A protein has these predicted regions:
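Short, charged, amphipathic alpha-helical segments
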Residues: 60-66, 90-91
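Nucleotide-sugar-dependent glycosyltransferase catalytic core
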Residues: 9-43, 57, 82-84, 88
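C-terminal, non-catalytic tails of nucleotide-sugar-dependent glycosyltransferases
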Residues: 42-63, 102-107
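Short, charged/polar low-complexity linear motifs in solvent-exposed/disordered segments
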Residues: 38-39, 47-48, 76-79, 123
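Short charge-dense sequence patches
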Residues: 1, 40-46, 126-135
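Amphipathic alpha-helical repeat scaffolds of TPR domains
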Residues: 65-78
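Hydrophobic residues within well-ordered alpha-helices
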Residues: 3-5
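Membrane-interface aromatic/basic loop that binds lipid-linked glycans or pyrophosphate carriers
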Residues: 81-142
Length: 142
């Protein structure tokens, strides 16, 4: 979808929801196997490569950075931290962000994060993975 939007001449918003997303039981999103979450790094390598090949990486730098913040740094880190707060993957996600998006902390879209995601984002930056895990255990009632 990201690649399609980058090449679209026009984007319109429709009043209803016309896309039904299905999360399969074995998908990386629902899997209790931490190692499956490494796949998001491959996906971002693909996205960044495609945008680079098409000369669009710099034009969409802020948007790609925020996409990585949302999906890689926050969502994937949350999935892993909830399973194993000492997983090496958490460091790999942080390293990937530093290497590919060195100025991600100044991204202009960060204010769009809601309060909860902003809290998680700050905890992840400080590598407080056990605190994140504990917060979600409390939230989930476990």
């Amino acid at each position: 979808m990201t690649k399609v939007l980058a090449l679209a001449e026009q984007v319109v918003r429709l009043p209803g929801a016309y896309y039904h997303y299905l999360q399969r039981e074995g998908s990386a999103m629902n899997n209790k196997n931490c190692a499956r979450n490494v796949e998001i790094l491959y996906a971002f390598d693909d996205i960044l490569g495609w945008f680079g090949e098409h000369g669009l990486r710099e034009a969409y730098r802020d948007e790609l950075t925020f996409l990585a913040i949302s999906h890689l740094l926050i969502a994937a880190s949350l999935r892993v931290a909830r399973i194993a707060s000492k997983s090496e993957l958490l460091g790999q996600f942080s390293d990937y962000m530093e290497k590919n998006f060195p100025d991600f902390r100044e991204n202009r879209y960060l204010p769009r994060l809601d309060r909860n995601k902003r809290l998680v984002y700050r905890l992840l930056l400080k590598r407080r993975y056990r605190v994140v895990r504990l917060l979600f255990r409390i939230k989930d009632g476990r």
